[in-house]
Regions:
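A generic structural micro-feature
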Residues: 32-36, 72, 89-93
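A short, well-structured alpha-helical segment
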Residues: 17, 36-41, 47-84
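Cysteine/selenocysteine-centered motifs that mediate thiol-based redox chemistry or coordinate metal-sulfur cofactors
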Residues: 82-104
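Acidic, low-complexity proline/glycine/alanine-rich linker and hinge segments
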Residues: 1-33, 69, 73-79, 105
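Hydrophobic residues positioned within well-ordered beta-strands of beta-sheet architectures
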Residues: 1, 40-42, 95-99
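Residues at secondary-structure transition points
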Residues: 8-9, 41-44, 93
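Generic alpha-helical hydrophobic packing signal
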Residues: 17-23, 55, 92, 96-98
Length: 105
């Protein structure tokens, strides 16, 4: 059972990042009035405190309707439980988040 205790100890000190707050992006007005739906994928760096920085738009479909801009703006408000290794928060680069824009049916 000594092995079990050791692994539980490690588990408590190490944890991966998990989203704890996902903001609702602002639906682009022109897309909304035309009934357009789409999505955008944003890449962020999760900070040691669980915030995000440097959001970059990677993909937007369909293009030109403002989904990308709205997603990047929303991404700045994402909150995560940060990745923790040996009890220390780690910065995590290259994390992707997909925002979907769907009309309420």
């Amino acid at each position: 059972s000594g092995g079990l205790n050791a692994s539980m100890g490690t588990f408590a000190r190490d944890s991966d990042f998990i989203p704890v707050y996902v903001p609702q992006p602002q639906y682009p007005r022109r897309a909304q009035t035309r009934g357009k739906e789409g999505y955008a994928v944003v890449e962020v760096i999760i900070t040691t405190a669980g915030g995000v920085r440097d959001p970059k738009l990677l993909e937007e479909l369909p293009e030109g309707w403002g989904f990308g801009r709205a997603a990047v703006k929303a991404a700045t408000k994402l909150k995560y439980n940060p990745r923790v290794i040996d009890g220390v928060g780690q910065e995590v680069p290259g994390v992707l988040y997909k925002f979907s824009f769907n009309m309420d049916k």
